[in-house]
């Protein structure tokens, strides 16, 4: 997913330089589609191969550790779709020249993680730990999606192009 983000940043920068705004939206849709496909594949791979892969690092005698690790990674991989949006939208915003705006997504993630660590983890324990990253990604998305739409609208106005 990180590679998708890097790709979309370069792609966005090149197309804004070439004044081809229509290609930016197409590239976004393509990268999001790839990310969502990856998310589904990763989910099923971890669901069925996760215990085997974890056993490469955790001894078979550590049954409770293996169970907790599988539980944790299943929560993580189940939320790869929101993580796709974090990478694609954040990096596209940066590639389009709005780096300062993209930083705020990190602020949203940090605030979510801080609130989770202060309030949810003490109340729910390991269950909350498993959801900490996914909730942080969703918090970033709550900022990033409208931010991208704002950037897109601003660029269309600047270039005198109707929105696609």
Regions found by a protein language model. Give the residues of each.
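Transmembrane helix-loop junctions in multipass membrane proteins, especially transporters and channels
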Residues: 51-60, 92-99, 121-126, 149-157
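Membrane-interface helix-loop junctions in multi-pass transport and translocation proteins
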Residues: 50-52, 110-142, 146
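Hydrophobic alpha-helical segments of multi-pass membrane transport proteins
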Residues: 75-89, 140-151
């Amino acid at each position: 997913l990180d590679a998708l983000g890097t790709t979309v940043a370069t792609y966005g920068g090149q197309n804004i330089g070439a004044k081809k705004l229509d290609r930016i939206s197409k590239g976004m849709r393509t990268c999001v589609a790839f990310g969502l496909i990856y998310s589904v594949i990763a989910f099923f791979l971890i669901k069925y191969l996760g215990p085997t892969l974890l056993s490469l690092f955790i001894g078979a005698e550590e049954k409770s550790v293996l169970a907790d690790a599988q539980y944790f990674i299943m929560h993580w991989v189940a939320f790869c779709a929101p993580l796709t949006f974090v990478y694609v939208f954040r990096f596209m915003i940066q590639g389009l020249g709005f780096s300062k705006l993209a930083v705020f997504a990190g602020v949203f993630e940090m605030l979510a993680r801080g609130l989770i660590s202060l309030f949810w983890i003490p109340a729910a324990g390991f269950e909350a730990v498993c959801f900490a990253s996914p909730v942080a990604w969703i918090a970033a998305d709550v900022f990033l999606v409208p931010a991208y739409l704002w950037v897109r609208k601003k660029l269309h106005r600047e270039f005198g192009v109707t929105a696609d």
